[in-house]
Amino acid sequence: MDRLTAETKIKELAKRIERHNRLYHEEDRPEISDQEYDQLMRELRELETSFPDLQSPDSPSLRVGGEPLPFFEKVVHKTPMLSLGNAFNEEDIRDFDRRVRQAVGSQAVRYVAELKIDGLAVSLHYENGLFVRGATRGDGTTGEDITQNLKTIRSIPLRLTKPLTLEVRGEAYMSKGAFEKLNKEREERGEALFANPRNSAAGSLRQLDPKIAASRQLDTFIYGIGDLQGETVESHSEGLDLLETLGFMVNQERRVFDDVDELLAFIAGWTEKRPHLPYEIDGMVIKVDSYAQQEELGFTAKSPRWAIAYKFPAEEAVTILEGIEVSVGRTGNVTPTALLKPVSLAGTTVKRASLHNEDIIREKGLLIGDHVVVKKAGDIIPEIIAVLPERRTGNEVPFAMPTHCPECGSELVRLEEEVALRCINPMCPALIREGMIHFVSRTAMNIDGLGEKVVAQLYRDGIIHSVADLYYLHQQRDALLGLERMGEKSVDNLLAAIEASKENSLERVLFGLGIRLVGAKAARVLAEHFGNIDTIMQASEEEITQIDEIGPKMAASLVNYFAQPQAQAVIERLRAAGVNMEYKGIRIESGADLPFSGKTIVLTGTLTQMSRQEAEEAIARLGGKVTGSVSKKTDLVIAGEKAGSKLEKAEKLGVAVMDEAGFLQVLESNA
C-alpha cells in the first residue's frame, strides 16, 4: 500500500473507531460487536506500524497500551486537588448549609448534589483540545504521571469537540461487573484477588505496563474543571454541561437544589438505591453551584468551604467466625469459605463469606472464634474486611488448609505463580461433578431442568460419568424415573431440553467443557475465529496466540486440554450424539417490520423465564440492540423482577417500559 492510500485509510479507520467509541460510551447504542471493533483496531495498528509517522496524537490505537515505563514521573498540580470535609448525618448537612448561607449573606444559594464514585481521583490536561497529560491526585499537591494508562480508557476523549486548553478532574473506576469478571479470571489463573473495585482500579492505573491497564475494563466520570482557557462558565452545573458537550462522561445522576430539605430527601433516596447501581459509590458530594460564591467562601487549609462529602452509613456488621470449610471447584481450586454466626446485613441474613485462598486467611490473621467485620456491597458476596483481635478470649484456634483433596484424597499442589491450592487429579469426583454442573449451566449449554442437585444425584448414583453421558440419558429412562421428584412429565421435559441443547453454537460447547482459563468471551472469540472444534483441536499454541484476545497461558491450556485422550473421547461421544461442533453466531433476522428493528433496548431486573444472555440473543434476532444503561437514546426498557434505578430513570425520561410478560408475548408472536 502506498503512503497516500495508507494515510486515507488510517484517517477513515480512526474516524470509524471514534464513532463507535462515542456510540458505546456516550450514547449507549453500540452498532458493532466487540470482535468487529477489535478487527478495526487491528487494521489501524497494522497500518500505523507500517507508517509510524502517520499516527496522530489522538489515534484510537493509543488506547491499547504502549511499552512499559521504568517509573512514574511526578506531576505538580497547578491547582491543588484538595480533599473534602465529611458529613455523616442530616445535622452535618444542615450545619454546612447554615455556614454557607451565613457567609454569603442575603444571596440566594443553590447546591449541586452528585454521586461520590468510589474510585481513583485523576487530573486530565488538554492543550488545544488534545489530551496531553493525566495524573493521580497523590497527596493533593503532587501526583504521578499516568498518561499512558489513562489513554487506554475509552471513555476519556483523546481529542475534545472544541480546541480548548483546560484541566479537568474526575474519578477512574471499575464497575461491579468488570470487577467480578476480573477476580473470576484471576481466581481461575490462581492469582491473588483484588479486595474491591476501588483497589482494582487504583492497582490497574498504577501498573508500569499500560497493556495491563488496557486489558481491564476501566471507566471514568468527570466531575469538575480545574483550569479553563478560552471559555467562560459561571457555575458548577454550567461547567458540567460544558464538559458533556466536550465529549467527557459526566454522571447523569445529579440534581440542583435551592432547598436543603429537598437536598436531604435526594440523599436519602440514594441511600436506598445505591446497591442497584452498576458501580460503587460511597456517598454524595454537595457543592455550592455559583463559582462567584465558591470564591467568596474560599478554603480552609485542607478543604474547600463550598463543598462537603456526605458518607453513607457503612454496610458492615460484626459477627463471629464459627468455622472454615473448603470446597473443590471445577478447575481443581480448593477454596475456603468462612462460616459465620448469622448476622443481618444490608437487608439479608449473612451466614457465609468468601475467603478465596489460604493467603487471605494468613494475611488477615484469622482464627476460628474471632470477632470479624463483614461487609456487603450491592450483590457482591459478603467478605471479611477486618479482624477484631482486641475481643479475643484465648479460646480461638488457628485454621490449617488441608494438604490433601477433601474429595479424592490426592495431594494438593500450588502451581508456580499461583496462590490457590489445587487438586490436579482428573478423576477427582469434585472436578467431574462441578464440571458437569458448569456444562449444563445457563451460560454454557443451558439445559433447563438439570440443576446442581439433579446433576449431583445423577453422578452420585452412577448414571452419568462425564458430560457426554448426558446425551445418552434417553437410554436410561427408568433410572431417571427413579430419581427424587422425577415423574413422567419431568423426564420428558428434561430429555427434550437435552435434545434442544444439541443445536447450540460451538462457543457454548467450548465454554461448557470447562477448559482452564477459557471464559465465555474467549470461547466466543475462539469459535468465531476457527469456526469448528476440529480446527481448534489441531491448532498450535503459536496459531492460537495470533488472536489478539488470547494470551500464551490460555493457548497452552487449550493445547494441553485437547492433547488429553480423555478430552478427545468426550468430544467424540458428544459429536456422535449429535451435538453441534460448529460456530453459528447470532442469526439476525432481516426485515424492517421486526418488532425491535432499529430499537435500543435496556434489560433491568431479573427475568424468571430465561437468562439475560438468552434475552439479549432474542432481542438481536428481532432487530434490536441491547445496551447497559438508560439514556434519552433508549427506545425501550424491559423490566424483570426487582428492577431498580434503571426503571426509575426510564420513567423519569419517559422511556417506554415493557414487563417480562409483554416481552414473552412479543417473542411468542415472532417465533
UniProtKB/Swiss-Prot annotation:
This is DNA ligase. The lineage of its organism: Bacteria, Bacillati, Bacillota, Bacilli, Bacillales. It comes from Brevibacillus brevis (strain 47 / JCM 6285 / NBRC 100599). DNA ligase that catalyzes the formation of phosphodiester linkages between 5'-phosphoryl and 3'-hydroxyl groups in double-stranded DNA using NAD as a coenzyme and as the energy source for the reaction. It is essential for DNA replication and repair of damaged DNA. It comes from the Bacteria. SMART domains: BRCT, HhH1, LIGANc. Zn(2+) binds at C405, C408, C423, C428. Belongs to the NAD-dependent DNA ligase family. LigA subfamily. Keywords: DNA damage, DNA repair, DNA replication, Ligase, Magnesium, Manganese, Metal-binding, NAD, Zinc. PROSITE patterns: BRCT, DNA_LIGASE_N1, DNA_LIGASE_N2. Its cofactor is Mg(2+); Mn(2+). GO terms for cellular component: cytosol. NAD(+) binds at D34, Q35, E36, Y37, D38, S83, L84, E114, R137, E171, K287, K311. CDD domains: BRCT_DNA_ligase_like, LIGANc.
